Amino acid sequence: MRVLGIDPGLRNLGWGVISVQGSRLRHVANGQIRSEGSELAQRLLSLYRQLTEVVAGHAPDAAAVEHTFVNKDATGTLKLGQARGIALLVPAAAGLEVAEYAPNHVKKSVVGVGHAAKEQVQHMVKLQLPGVVLAGADAADALAIAICHAHHLQSRGKVVAVNRTVAAPDGLRSVS
């Protein structure tokens, strides 16, 4: 089973794909999408197109997106919310179930502490995905979101069920 994690951002959107087989996690790919254009509509379209390419290219089975927090800059929060809408829309349009997690939940799941620093998150992502080369901080966060969702799916027994379905002899694709 492949899980796509997305760390939404208007200028930089982080993404990461991991493969989950039982309790084993393996890095597939990660990157950062930089929006193009100066107008909001152009940036959102750029995010949409590039994220659609990521989903098509890596064929995830599930997706997870980080919740955004509200800050004092209402305009900035609204713009980030619009980028988050793209992050939710693209995998949903591809037929994926999309989960959402609060930043503190992701950190607690990956690091063990809900208020972990970015450096701690990056360190734990590297430990859980040996050999990974991070494309940047946003990509590391996206991989952490994917790991968090994988842990959630494992606790619900969904990984085993999906792995059986995908590896079934009736012609469905095999999971790597």
From Swiss-Prot:
GO terms for molecular function: crossover junction DNA endonuclease activity; DNA binding; magnesium ion binding. Its EC number is 3.1.21.10. The keyword Coiled coil does not apply. It catalyses: Endonucleolytic cleavage at a junction such as a reciprocal single-stranded crossover between two homologous DNA duplexes (Holliday junction). The keyword Nuclease applies. It comes from the Bacteria. Its cofactor is Mg(2+). Mg(2+) 2 binds at residue 66. PROSITE patterns: RUVC. It is found in: Cytoplasm. Pfam families: RuvC. Mg(2+) 1 binds at residues 7, 138. InterPro entries: RNaseH-like_sf, RNaseH_sf, X-over_junc_endoDNase_Mg_BS, X-over_junc_endoDNase_RuvC. One of its GO terms (biological process) is DNA recombination. GO terms for cellular component: cytoplasm; Holliday junction resolvase complex. The active site is at 7, 66, 138. Keywords: Cytoplasm, DNA damage, DNA recombination, DNA repair, DNA-binding, Endonuclease, Hydrolase, Magnesium, Metal-binding, Nuclease. Binds 2 Mg(2+) ion per subunit. Belongs to the RuvC family. PANTHER family: CROSSOVER JUNCTION ENDODEOXYRIBONUCLEASE RUVC (PTHR30194:SF3). The RuvA-RuvB-RuvC complex processes Holliday junction (HJ) DNA during genetic recombination and DNA repair. Endonuclease that resolves HJ intermediates. Cleaves cruciform DNA by making single-stranded nicks across the HJ at symmetrical positions within the homologous arms, yielding a 5'-phosphate and a 3'-hydroxyl group; requires a central core of homology in the junction. The consensus cleavage sequence is 5'-(A/T)TT(C/G)-3'. Cleavage occurs on the 3'-side of the TT dinucleotide at the point of strand exchange. NCBIfam families: ruvC. Homodimer which binds Holliday junction (HJ) DNA. The HJ becomes 2-fold symmetrical on binding to RuvC with unstacked arms; it has a different conformation from HJ DNA in complex with RuvA. In the full resolvosome a probable DNA-RuvA(4)-RuvB(12)-RuvC(2) complex forms which resolves the HJ. This is Crossover junction endodeoxyribonuclease RuvC.
